[in-house]
Amino acid sequence: MLNASLKQLSAMLAARKISSVELTSEFLKRSRALNPEYNAFITLDERTSLAQAQAADILIGSGRGQPLTGVPIAQKDIFCTKGWLTTCGSKMLSNFISPYDAHVIGRFNAVGAVNIGKTNMDEFAMGSSNETSFYGPVKNPWDTAAVPGGSSGGSACAVAARMAPAATGTDTGGSIRQPAALCGISGLKPTYGLVSRYGMIAFASSLDQGGPMAKSAEDLGLMLNVMAGFDARDSTSLEREPEDYTRDLEKPLDGLRIGLPKEYFVKEIAEDVARAVEAAIGQYRKLGAETVEVSLPNTKLSVPVYYVLAPAEASSNLSRFDGVRYGYRAPDYLDLNDMYRKTRAQGFGSEVKRRILIGTYVLSHGYYDAYYIQAQKLRRLMAQDFAEAFKECDIIMGPTSPTVAFDLGERSSDPVQMYLSDAYTIAVNLAGLPAMSIPVGFGHKNRPVGLHIIGNYFAEAQMLNVAHQYQLESDWHTRMPKE
């Protein structure tokens, strides 16, 4: 049951071979046993989860079950969840019980899925290793000396360790795809605007996007069928006809043109990552695809551009956390201004403070034109790079991360090295494109390697087809870490 797909679990539930209460109990038992070691969950609420499972069993018994009814799903602790502690990995929200559900939570509630728990994450989604969480670092289940990636490290760890069959994540610069790669699971960042951001605590609003994390591409499609959809409460939500993202999974890949950016295959990639990625691309050739070289000339600028734009938006978004209406408030202060200063100084961690300072600096008088405006111009050029590349190919591929998971603490004292962990994922967010990572092997110290698959706007069904066809010929996505 631990390795069963979402489709298989849904079929078992529909056929009454197992109840949602039994299924949820099994995953809760496993989560409670493993969480002290991995720290994947911030909150587990057994009573609420089992109550949802009981309600799901009633739905299924009355013939009103849908795909994912009764299936336990782990939710990243960035999504507001009514009646649940919603911390965003921060001391600032360590006492915040959300009074409402985020769009994503509401969509899963509507189909009768079970919320098995809220997963750990980098504070306010700012990090690439899940070491900035107020609740402590998450450990990689393949090697507990290694990071799981971030910021959705808790979700990636929970799925990889089979503490949950699937999870939600968010991706601002790679925060679904990078931890998916480092933990050996599949993760999808949809086209910007496809999944509503309502109730998703904001980091950088023009870059943030929610998405699914699961063992396989097929599971991602089933999750996206629930998560995607127009929401009038989010001004950036796209009004599109609903579609079945699993519809093309079995389509053969004959004639598929795979673009290989020359900027992605450079000496900075670790040899073990390069070998696994090249072997996967070779398998695609056997499946009937052809490869063409393309160029994304502004790729090298994606990290500096991102670290101007994302902190600028964060400095504005995080100004709302002041201790007045909700969240942490400093216990001792002289006056209102002193309360603001002490609350934010004590409530935010060092990485969040660093990005607020950077963002405030680049938006300040005298630097706005030199940094922020120039970064926006380069962002447009990166989108144009992808548009030109997609004239030559259908899908773009490369490594998700330049290395396998690095050791805990290895980069925490060097922010620039940490930021470079997302060198291959950031440009996708700047362009608003969809992209995903799937496991394609193992490298140094038996740590997983991920293949990055980038599609054109709204090409999620095609990307899932491309990933699924590879997974029919491989078993990397079915492998479990040793306990």
From Swiss-Prot:
Name any one GO molecular function. Answer: glutaminyl-tRNA synthase (glutamine-hydrolyzing) activity
Q: Which GO terms describe its cellular component?
A: glutamyl-tRNA(Gln) amidotransferase complex
- Give the residue spans that cross the bilayer: none
Documented EC number(s) = 6.3.5.7
* The protein's role, per its UniProt record: Allows the formation of correctly charged Gln-tRNA(Gln) through the transamidation of misacylated Glu-tRNA(Gln) in organisms which lack glutaminyl-tRNA synthetase. The reaction takes place in the presence of glutamine and ATP through an activated gamma-phospho-Glu-tRNA(Gln).
EC supergroup of this enzyme = ligase
Is Glycoprotein set as a keyword in this record?
Answer: no
Q: Which reaction does it catalyse?
A: L-glutamyl-tRNA(Gln) + L-glutamine + ATP + H2O = L-glutaminyl-tRNA(Gln) + L-glutamate + ADP + phosphate + H(+)
Keywords of this protein's UniProt record, alphabetized? ATP-binding, Ligase, Nucleotide-binding, Protein biosynthesis
What is one GO biological process annotated to this record? translation
Catalytic residue positions: K76, S151, S175
Instruction: Supply the name of the protein.
Output: Glutamyl-tRNA(Gln) amidotransferase subunit A
